[in-house]
Regions:
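Surface-exposed, charged secondary-structure patches
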Residues: 109-155
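Terminal targeting/leader modules
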Residues: 22, 146-155, 160-161, 176
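Positively charged n-region of N-terminal signal peptides that target proteins for export
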Residues: 1-4, 8
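Short beta-strand edge/turn micro-motifs at domain boundaries
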Residues: 159-182
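Core segments of small alpha/beta cavity-forming domains
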Residues: 29-117
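Sec-dependent signal peptide cleavage junction
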Residues: 15-29
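Short acidic DE-rich linear segments
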Residues: 7, 23-27, 179-182
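Bacterial N-terminal signal peptides
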Residues: 8-16
Length: 182
């Protein structure tokens, strides 16, 4: 009986220490290279889905193929999963800071037109192999981390250098530029 009580006390003493360590890591400034790469690839996917006006993973999505001209730019309506500013913002918010989303809407002329979200028609994607990029932390201040990526071209011709800044917003790491991973 004494052994059982000793074991239970040991477990009770160890569990709170482990739980507090896990909680500390959740709110600490730590950001691993694996997390950085995963978030960067997710940001790239979210950016290109936004620019195409459609998320291929969305279920029951409906899209209009109608194009129109807005401020001299051929534009198209976004599919139903991005039909409102709130829906599109909710899609982008887990990956990008509020400031990145706001500035990205302005930079890329993402607009609400006749009550529906629309985006200028573009060429889409580039020839960089982001999944094969190497990462180097180049700046670390409080809740901000900047990484330099060396991204090989898919045709093997050149390696592009890109800098991506991560900011801790609402206790979660997010990317501070909508087009950071293009």
């Amino acid at each position: 009986m004494k052994k059982l009580i000793v074991c239970l006390l040991a477990v009770l003493l160890i569990l709170p220490a482990g739980a507090s360590l896990a909680a500390k890591n959740q709110t600490s400034g730590n950001l691993t290279n694996k997390q950085v790469m995963q978030m960067t690839l997710q940001a790239r996917e979210h950016f290109w889905n936004t620019m195409s006006g459609h998320n291929p993973k969305a279920k029951n999505s409906t899209c209009q193929t109608k194009t129109f001209e807005y401020r001299g730019l051929p534009s198209t309506y976004m599919c139903s999963e991005f039909s409102t500013k709130a829906k599109l913002t909710d899609y982008l918010a887990p990956v990008f800071t509020k400031d990145a989303i706001k500035k990205g809407f302005e930079k890329y002329n993402i607009m609400s037109y006749k009550g529906k979200m629309a985006v200028p028609v573009g060429d889409g994607d580039n020839l960089l192999g982001w999944d094969k990029a190497t990462i180097k932390l180049i700046s670390q201040k409080n809740n901000t981390r900047t990484y330099e990526f060396s991204v090989p071209a898919l045709d093997g011709s050149v390696t592009a250098k890109r800098k991506i800044t991560f900011v801790k917003e609402d206790n979660k790491w997010k990317i501070n530029q909508l087009d950071a991973a293009i």
